Every structure is written in C-alpha cells, then in structure tokens.
C-alpha cells in the first residue's frame, strides 16, 4: 500500500486505498486554530468549524436525514494547530460525500439568527467544559505562557460576540486557501472516484494563500528552564497534572511515540500498572502528547484521594526513574506500536488521521507501509532511555494540583520531586 499525492487547484489531495473494506473516510484538513489567532479573535477557528457545518445544513434539503439515508457520518474538530472535517460512509456513497465536502468551500448562506445560535452553542460548550476553572486550563497557561499555544481553542464569550458573519467569511477564505488545505481519502475508493473528485475541486473558487502558516510556536524563557514550582489551585476533589517540555527537533518522533506508549497506552502502560493495577491509588488518567514542529509537552492528569497525594507523586517519580534505568519491556511496546500501525489499515478513519498528521501536518518521520518498520520504528531501546533521561528532568517539569490548598504539603512534594534528577 502506497500513499498517492497530487495537487488540484492549489489543494493537496492524498489517498491510500483498500478495496477490501466496505467504507471510506474523506477528510479536509487545514491550518487554523488558536496558535494562528490573536487575543482579539481567539476562538474564531472553532467558530468557523461550527459555521461550516451549519452552512452545509442550509445547502442541502433535510441535511441530517440525507446523511442518515446514505449511512454517512459527518464530524468536525478544532485543534490548536489545525481543523479536521471528516466524512465516513459506505463505499458506494463516495460521490455524495464529495458533493458535501466541496460545499465546505462555498460562501456562507446563513442568517444572523442562525449565526448567533451557533455562538450560543459554543458558549454552552465553554460552560459545559467549565474551562476557566478547570485544571487543564490552569495547566495550559503555566506550560505555554507567553507563546501562541497559550490561547484556548474554544475562545471567550466576549470575543465571540465581536465576530461578525463578514469577518468570519473573510477568515474562511484565508483558511480555505491554496497551499493551506489537505484532502485525504482512505478506505474503499477507486481511481475513478478520485478523478471525479478532482473535477469537482477544479471547479471551486479558491483564493491564493496570502500568508504561509507554519506549525511552530515561540519558545518562552521558562521552557526548558522550569523552577519546579508546585502550582496549587483550590478545589474540592484532588487532581494532579504533570507535564514535561520536549525539544521536538531533537528526537525521532517514533522515540517520543514509543516513550508515550510505554507510559500511557493500554494495560501495559506504566502509569496504569504503578498507580492503579498494583497500588490502587487511582482509577484512570488522561494523557496527551502536544507537539509542534519545534517543541512539545508530554503530560498526564489523574484524580487521587487527598491522603494519597504524596504517595501518588512518589510512584510517578519512581516509574519515570525506572524508565531512565531501562526497566521496561522495550520489545513488547515496540511490537504493540507496530501492530497498532498495521491494524489501522482496516480502520479508514484512524488511518486517515494518522497519515495526514504524521505525513503532512507535523514535520516528522512519515508513515510508510512499504517499509518493514513503517518508516518510523527502526529504533533502539537505548534511544528511548536517552530521551527519557533528557526529558524527565525538573528543569522540564510543570506540576499543577487542584485541591484543598491548606491540606497539601508543598514541602513534602518538593522533596519527592528532587529525586527525579538523581539518575541524570
């Protein structure tokens, strides 16, 4: 299986076919998001995602029924650095999906009431996520302060109120411009299907790109020079979030992915085994590897009993030091990652995201299904250990705790954290 790439009307068109499947995935990716925004329009990318989907509803009669009648699923998501709009469906409904996709490039045909209703839905999303008081919001500010990544994806209610339909339509043209869009097709699609899509794309009115957007963020003075301050936010339940700064240009991305997998993926994950399976301190956790072309942050969050905060942090430091010492099953984790990559061939949606992200959005090693190591996983245990030693240091660490400030022993936690650098 090989990736096919062509350019049509300024749009990069990528595909990887699998005729053995019963479905396809058709996605539009374009560079937008909070790292390309400023304080006066923060949240405009997320609003654009909503309005693009709302606009489709007005372009087709009984749009949601139309999707259901043809077994088509339509989704949108906004990240800090790009937007993805995805259509999944049965292989014989591809032409209908391409009609829908091409309508995303059309002018808005919504009225003021519909526009304001979508803003209200986003405001409800902001409230539902309790973003301003959340530990995630607090942590994000700590890690990305004074950089483009500090801004929230959802934006702010007052900023949303200031965005007009005309302003958003101008932003749409800027985003859906030549050399800023990728259309990716995976699953059971034929070359003839692709040719018909190319004809439709050629008919679209797409403006020239005025400013090339790159997937990098500024490096603040604090990045790689953390003071290991214990940041505490008042709250009833106790949550801990820990993250580490990463120099993205220093390591092969497969090393970072494997390190992330060792820590967080599946029942073999060290976080799961150390803190949940073996010691019953936590039930579950959330984790993320936030990456840009130059820097990134690997982080995780969990809830813990107020009487086990010190124990939890002690175990986290122990497992990080164990990785530095090579006390993990490299072979099992590497095999798992390679099998995950192989099995994505049978999941058009997951494959679509991975190929678009690793091969075209993030500047890193590309996935290559013609290679025994999929273009990425010809790495050694020593590389992973060396990366762990360099990344898991106090100078790269941000820690934030949400709980009762009066009952959290900062001194004890500081003493525990100091043992993180003992092996470096």
Question: Where are the regions that the model predicts?
Answer:
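His/Glu-rich zincin catalytic helix
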Residues: 1-63, 169-274, 313, 396-424
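Charge-rich, well-structured scaffold segments of protease-associated domains
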Residues: 60-213, 246-247, 277-424
């Amino acid at each position: 299986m090989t990736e096919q790439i062509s350019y049509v009307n300024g749009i990069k068109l990528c595909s990887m076919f699998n005729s053995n499947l019963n479905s396809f995935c058709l996605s539009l990716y374009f560079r937008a998001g909070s790292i390309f925004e400023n304080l006066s329009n923060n949240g405009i990318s997320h609003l654009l995602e909503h309005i693009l989907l709302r606009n489709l509803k007005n372009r087709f009669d009984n749009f949601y029924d139309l999707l259901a009648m043809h077994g088509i699923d339509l989704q949108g998501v906004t990240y800090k650095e790009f937007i993805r709009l995805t259509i999944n469906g049965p292989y014989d409904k591809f032409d209908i999906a391409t009609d829908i996709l091409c309508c995303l490039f059309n002018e808005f045909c919504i009225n003021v009431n519909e526009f304001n209703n979508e803003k209200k839905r986003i405001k409800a999303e902001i409230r539902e996520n309790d973003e301003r008081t959340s530990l995630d919001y607090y942590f994000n500010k700590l890690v990305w302060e004074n950089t483009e990544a500090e801004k929230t994806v959802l934006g702010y209610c007052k900023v949303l109120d200031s965005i007009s339909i005309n302003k958003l339509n101008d932003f749409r043209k800027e985003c859906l411009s030549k050399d800023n869009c990728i259309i990716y097709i995976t699953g059971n699609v034929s070359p003839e299907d692709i040719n018909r899509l190319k004809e439709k794309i050629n008919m679209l009115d797409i403006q020239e790109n005025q400013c090339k957007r790159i997937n990098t963020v500024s490096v603040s003075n604090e990045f790689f020079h953390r003071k290991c301050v214990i940041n505490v936010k008042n709250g009833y339940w106790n949550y801990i979030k820990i993250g580490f700064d990463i120099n993205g240009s220093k390591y092969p991305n497969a090393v970072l992915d494997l390190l992330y997998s060792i820590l967080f993926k599946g029942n073999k994950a060290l976080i799961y085994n150390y803190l949940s399976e073996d010691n019953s301190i936590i039930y579950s956790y959330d984790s993320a590897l936030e990456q840009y072309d130059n820097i990134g942050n690997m982080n995780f969050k969990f809830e813990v009993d107020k009487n086990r905060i010190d124990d939890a942090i002690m175990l986290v430091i122990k497992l990080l030091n164990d990785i530095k010492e090579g006390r993990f099953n490299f072979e099992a984790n590497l095999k798992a990652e390679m099998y995950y990559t192989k099995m994505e061939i049978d999941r058009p949606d997951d494959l679509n995201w991975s190929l678009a992200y690793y091969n075209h959005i993030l500047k890193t090693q590309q996935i290559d299904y013609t290679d025994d190591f999929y273009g990425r996983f010809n790495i050694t245990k020593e590389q992973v250990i060396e990366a762990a030693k360099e990344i898991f240091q106090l100078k790269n660490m941000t820690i934030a705790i949400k709980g009762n400030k009066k009952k959290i022993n900062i001194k004890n936690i500081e003493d525990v954290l100091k043992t993180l650098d003992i092996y470096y």
